[in-house]
Amino acid sequence: ITGNRCERGLGKEKVKNKLPNLFEYKMQRYFGYTPLKENEAVHGVIGIPRVLNMYENYPFWFTLFTKLGFSVLLSPASTRKIYELGIESIPSESECYPAKLAHGHVQWLINQGVTHIFYPSIPYERKEFADANNHYNCPIVTSYPENIKNNMDPIVQGEVDFIHPFLSLESEETVAYRMVEELGEKFSIDEKEIRAAVHDAWEELAACRNDMRKKGEETIQFLKETGNRGIVLAGRPYHIDPEVNHGIPELINSYNMAVLTEDSISHLNPVERPLNVMDQWMYHSRLYAAANYVKTVDNLDLIQLNSFGCGLDAVTTDQVAEILTNSDKIYTSLKIDEVNNLGAARIRIRSLLAAIRVREQRNTKRDIKPASIDKVSFTKEMRTTYTILCPQMSPFHFE
C-alpha cells in the first residue's frame, strides 16, 4: 500500500534519510533557545507568539529580552489544536493560514497566565538587497498585531498587557530608539542597558542569517560531491512551520533530494535588475534571488510554496516563473492552506522529477539569460503610432 502520507509502503522498514533538510535546520537554529528560569528573570515572564514575523526575527527578540532580564515564553510549534484555540476571533475566512494561526498562538500564551505579550508591527525589514526598490513587509505581516489587539477579548478587555509597537528593523539605531521608548519607562530599564541589549540582539540575528547561508553553501557542496539533486523549497519565513507546510520538505526528502530554503542561497547570484515587477517586498526579493541562482545550476530545481489568500504572491509566482523558464528551468508552484492533503503535492513533485529525467536524457544545453528586462521608453514620436491602454481603476483615477 503506497501513496498515502507515509513515506514508505506497508511492511517496509523505515530508513533514516540523511539528506539535508534546511527547513528542519532553520526551525532549530531560529527557535532552539533556552530561556532564563523564572527565578532568574528580574522582570518576570514575557510571552512571544510563534507567528509571521517571528519566523524572521525571533533570535533578535529572544536575545533582547533575555539580556534585559526577562524569561521568554515562546508559544509551541503550530498544530491543529493551536489553530482551534483562536478560531473564534479570526475576523475573515479569506486570510492566509499563517495569519489565522496567530490567534491560537496568542490565546495559548493567555491561557498560560502570561501578563505581558510582545508582538511588534514591523513595516520595514532590514534591507538585505541594496539594489531592491524597497524592503517592506506585506500588509498582513506588518499589521497583524493590530488585528489581534482588536479581535481578541482578553486583550480588548485589558486582561493582558499586549505590547505591539510599530517599528522598523532598517537599522540597529532605529530599533534601539524605539525600544527605549517602549520598554524604558514601562519596566524601569536604563537606556544604556536597552541599547547594549539591542546591539547583542542585532549581532545574534546576523549570526543566524550567516549560519543559514553557510548551511546552504555546505549543502550545495554536498550535492556536488555526492551527485544528488536538491530542491529549493522557496516561500516565506513562516513556511518552515510544519503545520503550514504540511510535511512537504520531508516528502521531498523521501524522493532522495535535499531540501534548501530560499534564504540559504539568495546571496549566491545577485539579481540582474530592473525586473518586470516592483521589487519592494523583503520576502519577495529573496525569492527572486534564489530563483536567479537556481537557474545557473543543473542539480537544483525550485518549488514555490504559495499560501491561499496571499494576494501579493500573484506577483511573485509570475516573476519567479519568468526568471526560471527564461533559462529553460522548470517552475513548480504548490498552493497550501489549512487542508492537510499531500496527494496533489506528490503528483506535482513526481511530475517534476519525470520532466527532469527527460531533460537529462536529452542532454540539451541551456541558455542562461539575465533576469532583467530592457524597458522601452515612450517617446514623443510614438504618440502618432502607439496607443496607451490605461483602464480607470477608481472614480478619481484620471483626476
Regions found by a protein language model. Give the residues of each.
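An N-terminal assembly and electron-transfer interface module characteristic of large anaerobic redox
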Residues: I1-E399
